[in-house]
Amino acid sequence: MNSAPSFDDRKRVVERGYDKVAHDYARLEGETAWPRMRWLKKMLNQLEPGSSILDLGCGSGDPADIEVAKEHKVTGVDISQTQINLARQNVPTGNFIHGDAGSVEFPVASFDAVISFYTLEHIPREEHETILRRIHQWLRPDGFLLISLEAGEVDSIISEWLGVPMHFSCFDPETVKWLVNRVGFEIVETEIESQVEQGDAIPYLWLLARKQ
């Protein structure tokens, strides 16, 4: 019997996949930008100009980090070097780091907000609580967390996503909200919204929280 893929195996699938589909995914980001930008602006309206914002799983930086960089300092992390290269082109004022969201390090109280769109769903869900705790540490008092991820329980590598294998790993929305509360956040607002990707309507959980 074949053993289940290791954490590292699953992460390599994500890294290779996003390296290969970077330009196709950038187009998809443009087609599905509206919920991301609506939630992002909702959070940005509560921050002072010049705030420090971390985008965990930043992709190409378009459109979110382009918007953030208009008035704020942006740091982005992505497991795909190709995506990081695109982000550096799209947002020249940003600081973009090639790294794994599960192991990257920042000093305590480094950021006023952390955003992570469509990223946790690619990280083994066994790591989600640990990553949320680390985000809580990186945030300054009253800092914001804004995340989105697929609103369904899944843990598998699918054979075809934009033409490549891809790993998805999510808890159900109630468990995600429980974890966010458990690590020390107060949830400000949540919503499940569907968006069409490759002809399919996929529900996503959007969650805005604040560090207690």
Show the residue positions of the predicted features.
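Conserved class I S-adenosyl-L-methionine
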Residues: 1-48, 153
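Class I SAM-dependent methyltransferase SAM/SAH-binding core
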Residues: 54-103
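A short glycine-rich, Lys/Arg-flanked "PGG" loop and its adjoining helix->strand segment in the class I
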Residues: 129-141
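A conserved beta-strand element that flanks and buttresses the S-adenosyl-L-methionine
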Residues: 115
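Short, glycine-/aromatic-enriched active-site segment of Class I SAM-dependent methyltransferases
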Residues: 150-167
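Conserved beta-strand signature within the Rossmann-like core of class I S-adenosyl-L-methionine
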Residues: 142-149
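Core SAM-dependent methyltransferase catalytic element
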Residues: 196-212
